[in-house]
């Protein structure tokens, strides 16, 4: 998705770092890091230490659409990428952090048109005020993420969650 988004989205810059940064037991082992971006260059930091700058290479099938750091050694903490355009101006930044145990849920709600809408889920703090009609025509995508106590996503969490719809909506 992010590779394509970086190419077609003319209204917002794309900078997406992967993989997640939760690799217990891989400390000190090489863990490649990639970034999909509409920028042409990026600098990667592991716990604040630069891993160098890399540029996209249009002549390389593997490097024309992404930035790659193939020799990064995993250590818990934070990876951060800063991306730049052809003029050296910063266009984006993304961060992945090693997460603790799941402690809270985050709800994101949007329509098929990617319009954020009011989150009517108990515990949701979304501030948007577009409402859906239970007329069989409106649709919302609800994404639930588990976060640790510091708000970091827990990508390896496999907790079983149960949801219930109240009112005229269906699930």
Predicted regions and their residues:
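Substrate-binding clefts and catalytic carboxylate motifs of secreted carbohydrate-active enzymes
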Residues: 1-119, 128-131, 149-153
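A structural signal for short, hydrophobic beta-strand segments that form beta-sheets
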Residues: 17, 170-171
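Broad gene-expression machinery/nucleic-acid interaction feature
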Residues: 32, 141, 160
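Flexible glycine-/small-residue-rich
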Residues: 37, 146, 165-167
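Short loop/turn microsegments at loop-to-beta-strand junctions
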Residues: 39-40, 141-143
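Short, well-ordered beta-strand segments
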Residues: 49-51, 158-170
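Extracellular Ig-like/FN3 beta-sandwich strand-entry sites
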Residues: 74-78, 137-139, 158
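Surface-exposed intrinsically disordered loops and tails
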Residues: 124-126
């Amino acid at each position: 998705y992010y590779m394509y988004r970086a190419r077609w989205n003319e209204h917002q810059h794309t900078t997406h770092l992967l993989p997640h940064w939760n690799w217990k037991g891989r400390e000190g082992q090489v863990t490649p890091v990639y970034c999909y971006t509409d920028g042409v260059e990026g600098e990667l930091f592991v716990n604040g230490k630069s891993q160098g700058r890399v540029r996209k290479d249009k002549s390389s099938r593997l490097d024309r659409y992404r930035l790659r750091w193939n020799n990064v050694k995993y250590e818990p903490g934070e990876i951060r990428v800063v991306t730049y355009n052809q003029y050296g101006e910063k266009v984006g930044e993304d961060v992945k952090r090693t997460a603790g145990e799941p402690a809270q849920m985050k709800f994101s709600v949007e329509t098929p048109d990617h319009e954020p809408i009011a989150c009517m889920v108990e515990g949701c703090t979304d501030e948007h005020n577009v409402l859906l009609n239970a007329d069989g025509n409106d649709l919302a995508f609800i994404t639930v993420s588990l976060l640790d106590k510091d708000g970091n996503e827990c990508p390896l969490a496999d907790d079983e969650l149960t949801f219930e719809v109240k009112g005229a909506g269906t699930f």
